């Protein structure tokens, strides 16, 4: 299996002085995901948790939703010039009797951090393929101070980022702010898929009383993945896209952006944020 990091020579220029030294870089390799032997998608990812990534991707596509729908996931043969396995192709086998959505069977996709359809078609696709509505009855209720503390907890748990400075992260927290799981990857979407895939494998879906925190911005794709996993709250340290806000509003997802220090913007689902308490303190 590929390594999470690799070493490369770098020429460093600092205060006019030039030096050569080895540097630790985050690894990036393609992963082909097959469904019952048929090619489905290719994503650029950081090696590691590949089976969880594939499972989470299929949850996001509306293909899987229950642990018993998954028979197994295996690496396929894919040799390098020296004959060793590249571990860059995985095949997801569904359990006998599982009926697959027709739209996924012959679809070949190259996924990136900004993949997805456009506008209303994207919103409709999520609505028609989602396994669950977001149902956190009684609603998750979060104090702004708790939300504000999460980015520091995320950063403290980023082990590979400390060595490379080049990874995104996604983390699941309980409504009390306890860290449930964290994954790192060169792509935020992959990090989320790894979280969701592990939840599928452990039979924990839907994630109805959790908070998903992502480094960087909140794209439509990340909002889609949250909705498809039944996550009620998505928070990001940077801005959301307009389509992410539209999806959140339509799906009942709480969407928080610019979560930095003691400030944040709430774009949708404000009923889960204790706004009155925050106003009283201000």
UniProtKB/Swiss-Prot annotation:
Record Gene3D superfamilies: 3.10.20.10, Cytidine Deaminase, domain 2
HAMAP family (alphabetical): FdhD (MF_00187)
Keyword Flavoprotein annotated: no
Source species, domain of life: Bacteria
NCBIfam families named in the record: fdhD_narQ, PRK00724.1-2
Gene encoding the protein: fdhD
Gene Ontology terms for molecular function: sulfur carrier activity; sulfurtransferase activity
Pfam short name (any one): FdhD-NarQ
Cellular component per GO, a single term: cytoplasm
Family: Belongs to the FdhD family.
Keyword annotations of the record: Cytoplasm, Molybdenum cofactor biosynthesis
Role summary: Required for formate dehydrogenase (FDH) activity. Acts as a sulfur carrier protein that transfers sulfur from IscS to the molybdenum cofactor prior to its insertion into FDH.
GO BP annotation list: Mo-molybdopterin cofactor biosynthetic process
Active site: 115 (cysteine persulfide intermediate)
Localization annotation: Cytoplasm
Protein name listed in UniProt: Sulfur carrier protein FdhD
InterPro entries found in the cross-reference section: Cytidine_deaminase-like, FdhD
